[in-house]
Amino acid sequence: MARIAGVNIPTNKRVIIALTYIHGIGSFKAKQIADKLGIDHSRRVQDLSDAEILQIREAIDAEHTVEGDLRREVAMNIKRLMDLACYRGLRHRKGLPVRGQRTHTNARTRKGKAKPIAGKKK
C-alpha cells in the first residue's frame, strides 16, 4: 500500500484511478500529475518505484490543496459566508439549497427527510 497525502492508495489499480482516492484530486488532476512526471497512464501503483511514489507525493504537496487542508478551506469559506449573513450564508445556515434551486417541491437531499404535518390529509 502506497501512502500519499495521508491516504493509503490501492496498489492493484492504475495510477490515474488510484490518485483519485485522495480528496481534492479528480481524474483531470491525476492525469496532469502523471503527465508532468512522465508516468504512463496504464501503469499500476504496484509497478511504481519508491522514487516515483516520492515524486508523486512531492508534486501533490507542492502544487495541490488536498485532504484535510481542502476540507478546512471549504468549511472556512462556508463559515465566512454565514458570518457575513449574505444570502448564500443564510441559505447555508437554514440548510436550504444555495444555488437557486426550487424548494416548493424537491430539495429533499438538502432539507432532509420530509416532516409530517399534523392534521393534513390527502
From Swiss-Prot:
Signal peptide start and end residues: none
What is this protein identified as? Small ribosomal subunit protein uS13
Keyword check for Transport, yes or no.
no
Q: Report whether rRNA-binding shows up as a keyword of the record.
A: yes
**Entry function:** Located at the top of the head of the 30S subunit, it contacts several helices of the 16S rRNA. In the 70S ribosome it contacts the 23S rRNA (bridge B1a) and protein L5 of the 50S subunit (bridge B1b), connecting the 2 subunits; these bridges are implicated in subunit movement. Contacts the tRNAs in the A and P-sites.
- Note the NCBIfam families from the entry: uS13_bact
* Organism domain of life: Bacteria
Molecular function (Gene Ontology), one example: structural constituent of ribosome
Family named by the database record: Belongs to the universal ribosomal protein uS13 family.
Origin species, per record, is Novosphingobium aromaticivorans (strain ATCC 700278 / DSM 12444 / CCUG 56034 / CIP 105152 / NBRC 16084 / F199)
- Note the HAMAP family from the entry: Ribosomal_uS13
Q: Which PANTHER family match?
A: 30S RIBOSOMAL PROTEIN S13/40S RIBOSOMAL PROTEIN S18, SMALL RIBOSOMAL SUBUNIT PROTEIN US13M
Provide this UniProt record's keywords sorted from A to Z: Ribonucleoprotein, Ribosomal protein, RNA-binding, rRNA-binding, tRNA-binding
**Could you give the subunit structure recorded for this chain?**
Part of the 30S ribosomal subunit. Forms a loose heterodimer with protein S19. Forms two bridges to the 50S subunit in the 70S ribosome.
Question: PROSITE patterns attached here?
Answer: RIBOSOMAL_S13_1, RIBOSOMAL_S13_2
GO BP annotations, alphabetical order: translation
Question: Where are the stretches annotated Disordered?
Answer: 95-122
Task: Please give an example of a GO cellular component term from this record.
Answer: cytosol
